[in-house]
Amino acid sequence: MARRALDGVLLLDKPVGLSSNDALMRAKRLYQVKKAGHTGTLDPLASGLLPLCFGEATKFSQDLLEADKTYEATMRLGVRTTTGDAEGDVLDTRDVSCDEAAVRAALARFVGEIVQVPPMYSALKRDGKPLYEYARAGQTVEREGRTVTIRALALVSCALPDVTFRVTCSKGTYVRTLAEDIGEALGCGAHLTMLRRTGVGPLTLEHAVTLDALDAATQDERDARLAPVDALLSTFPCVKLDAALATRFLHGQRLKLSELAARPDAAEGGRVRVYDADDRLLGVARASEGVLAPERLVVTGA
């Protein structure tokens, strides 16, 4: 079957045990799409939302890479492992003497800006080599702490020694490390036993589909599962252009805001999504110094 020029966003519910790249390749084969990419790696041991971008949507995948993420996670108190999750060897065990009130208090202390030391079992590179390669060789290298932001952190359930929480966090946050640090704050250590991503920027797991469901579907049913390209941009203010302005915009011309029928509700230097009079997405622009400057164009008007 010939590859198709398909534009849109697939909200995939990735299963445990499959890498993000393997999930992307399976979806790409099912859709027979020419161009596809994912929006940030989800570890094989994690499940949940993995947005996949097809065609013109790939132009905006970076926006989701930078977006906040939401996860539901379960940690087991009293046990530390080499990897910070259930795959690692046990380092030590400690008594769990805290109660639910102490757990809630500990979670509250991690809301806001925090400093995390990246785990040794991670893909971050040192001298061109991923940290996990050093870790597998029994080596530990010095890592600098990185500032991340925990937007929200809520207790879902507490059945000690297991604690399930929901976290919304900035790009670059390691939930494994968060669980370990919470365990240390409680004086007993912890490791992650479950991780499920439920949100990426404005996108949620609620409308996601599994690979098994896609396997069983017809091509038309699969195509109907695709969200439009602008699903990635729903948090941006929008502006509509008449036919003449739309033509100029698609030729990369900067437009004076005074030429528009309605000025976009955007902060100075803010990004806006741009449509023509028929509500077709033309691209993304920046509104700055009285001018609407094209940033990325959608060539199909998808």
UniProtKB/Swiss-Prot annotation:
Which gene specifies this protein's sequence?
A: truB
Quote the protein name from its UniProt record.
tRNA pseudouridine synthase B
Q: Which UniProt keywords apply?
A: Isomerase, tRNA processing
The UniProt entry, under Gene3D superfamilies, shows: Pseudouridine synthase, PUA domain
Q: What does this protein do?
A: Responsible for synthesis of pseudouridine from uracil-55 in the psi GC loop of transfer RNAs.
Q: Respond yes or no to whether keyword Isomerase is given for this record.
A: yes
- Domain of life of the native organism: Bacteria
Residues in the active site? D43 (nucleophile)
Family to which the UniProt record says this protein belongs = Belongs to the pseudouridine synthase TruB family. Type 1 subfamily.
Q: Which Pfam families match?
A: TruB-C_2, TruB_C_2, TruB_N
A single GO BP term for this record reads:
tRNA pseudouridine synthesis
Q: Which InterPro entries match?
A: PsdUridine_synth_cat_dom_sf, PsdUridine_synth_N, PUA-like_sf, PUA_sf, tRNA_psdUridine_synth_TruB, tRNA_sdUridine_synth_fam1_C, TruB_C
Report the catalytic activity.
uridine(55) in tRNA = pseudouridine(55) in tRNA
Can you provide one Gene Ontology molecular function annotated for this UniProt record? RNA binding
Could you say which EC number(s) this protein's record lists?
5.4.99.25
